[in-house]
Amino acid sequence: MSSGKILNMLSPKEAYIQNHLRFNFIIGLFDGGFFGLGIGFASFTAIIPLFVHHLTDSALLIGLVPAIHNMGWQLPQLFTAGWLARARTFKPLTLWMTINERVPFLGLAIIAFFVPLLTKPTILILTFLMLLWQGFGAGFTANPWTNMVTKVIPQEMHGTFFGMQSAAFNGFAGISAITAGLILDKVVSPLNFSLCFLLAFFFLTISYFVLSFTREPVSHSREEEHPLAFWGKSLTLLKADSNFRAFLGVRILSQFAGMAFAFYLIYAVQKFKMSDAAAGIMVAILLIGQVVLSPLMGRWGDRWSHRGVMSIGAIGAALSAVLAWKANSLGWFYPIFILESVAIVAIWTIPIALSVSFAGNENERPIYIGMSNTIPAPAAILAPVLGGWLADTSGFDITFILSAISALFMAAALWLVVKDPAKK
C-alpha cells in the first residue's frame, strides 16, 4: 500500500505526526546534542561535584549535588500532570519551564568567578541555591517535554528515539567533558570552573532555540477537571494497576542501585590521586559508553523488552559498585565507568519509554509519567545523602556494598515481579 493511501487512512493528527516525523526526530537529536554539549561542561556527576570538593571535603555535601538534581527532576512531575491532562499542546509550557533549568548555569559561572571574594560557606550556599533552581526547573519541564516528545514520536519508536537522543546527548557531552578536563587542568582556579559553567549556559541556550522548532499538532479540546477529581483519578489508576506499582518499586530501588555513582570520581581522587584532567577523561568514557549503548539498548527494548534491558542495567550497576569496592589502582575505573554507563541508560533512559507504555490513552499519559517520577523522588534525594553519610562515617566501601545489594534486588524484582505492559 502506498504511503499516500496510508496517510489518507489516518486521523488529521496522526497524519500530521507522520508528515513531520522525520523533522521532529532530527530536531530532537540536535536538541539532545546541544543540551549534552552544555551539560558536559557542568556534569552533575563530575564537574559540579569537583567544584564543591574544592570548597569542602564533606562527602555528604558532595552527594547532595546529584541528589538535588534527581529530586528536582522527579518530584514536581505529578503536580503538573493535572494541567497537562487538559492541555491541547505541550510545547508552550515546555519552552517556558525549561528556561529555569538553563539560566542557573549562568548563575554558577558568576558564583565561581567571585570565589576569591567570598567565604566558602557563602559560595556553597549560593551554589546549592542555583542547583535547587536548576533541579526544580528541570522537574517542571520534564512532564510537558516528555508528553510533547511522546506525542510527536509514535509509540513503537519511543525506545529508539530516546536511545538515539541519549546517544547524541552523551556523545557531545563526552566531547565537552574532555574539553572541561583540559580547562580545569590548564586554566587557573576558580576561573576554570567559571568558564566551564559559562560554556554550559551558552550551549544550553542554543539547545533551547533548536527545541523551539518542534512541530506539535493540536489535540482535541478536553474537559476541565476539578483538582480533587484529578488526584482521585491518579489514585484510582495506581490502585488498579499492580504491575505499575511494582514498576514504581523498581524505580525506588534504582535510586539506591545508582547511589554509588556520585562517589566514584571523588573516591578515585582521594584514594588514587586522580588528576582533574584524568577525571575529565573518565567522564568522557562514561558518556561515550552511553553514546554506544543508548541507541542499542533503546532499540533492543523496542524489539524485545524494556523491562529486560533495565534488568541488565541493574546487573551493570551491581558490578560497577563491586569493582569500585575492590579496586586497587586507577586502571580499575575504566571498566567501572563502562558498567556505570550501562546502568545509567537502564535507570534513566529506558524507564522513560517504559513508563509511557503503561498509559491506556493520551489523557492518562501525563499521570503515568508524573507518578513514575514523583513517587520515587524522596528516594532520589535520600539515596545520595545516605551514601554520602555512610562514606563520611564508615567509608566509601559501605556505600558501594549497599549500592550493589540494591542493584541486585532491582534486577530480581524486574525478572520476578514486573511484567511487560501490553502495547497500546
What are the roles of these predicted feature ranges?
Residues 2-75, 84, 91-94, 98-101, ...:
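Helix-loop boundary and gating motifs at the non-cytosolic
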Residues 59-60, 91, 155-164, 276, ...:
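Loop-to-transmembrane helix entry/capping segments in MFS-fold secondary transporters
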Residues 76-89, 184-185, 293-305, 391:
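Helix-to-loop junctions at the C-terminal end of transmembrane segments
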Residues 90-92, 121-123, 182-202, 389-407:
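A membrane-interface helix-boundary motif in multi-pass transporters
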Residues 92-110, 198-201, 308-323, 401-404:
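Structural signature of the two symmetry-related core transmembrane helices
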Residues 110-130, 325-337:
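Helix-loop junctions at membrane interfaces in 12-TM secondary transporters
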Residues 140-153, 346-360:
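Intracellular juxtamembrane helix-capping segments at the cytosolic ends
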Residues 215-233, 422-424:
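Flexible cytoplasmic inter-helical loops of multi-pass small-molecule transporters
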